Amino acid sequence: GWTLNSAGYLLGPHAVDNHRSFNDKHGFT
């Protein structure tokens, strides 16, 4: 499963920001 940690670690800060935006759109915040 993908997490903010794994996304940030594997892809970089831009991936973390993108993931946050994704979560926000789905109301997972």
UniProtKB/Swiss-Prot annotation:
Record-listed Threonine amide modification sites: T29
Location(s), subcellular: Secreted
GO terms assigned for molecular function: hormone activity
GO CC field: extracellular region
KW Protein transport (keyword) present: no
Keywords from the named record: Amidation, Hormone, Neuropeptide, Secreted
UniProt keyword Secreted present: yes
Biological processes, Gene Ontology terms: neuropeptide signaling pathway
InterPro entries linked: Galanin, Galanin_pre
Cited function: Contracts smooth muscle of the gastrointestinal and genitourinary tract, regulates growth hormone release, modulates insulin release, and may be involved in the control of adrenal secretion.
Family: Belongs to the galanin family.
Protein name (Swiss-Prot/TrEMBL): Galanin
Gene that encodes it: GAL
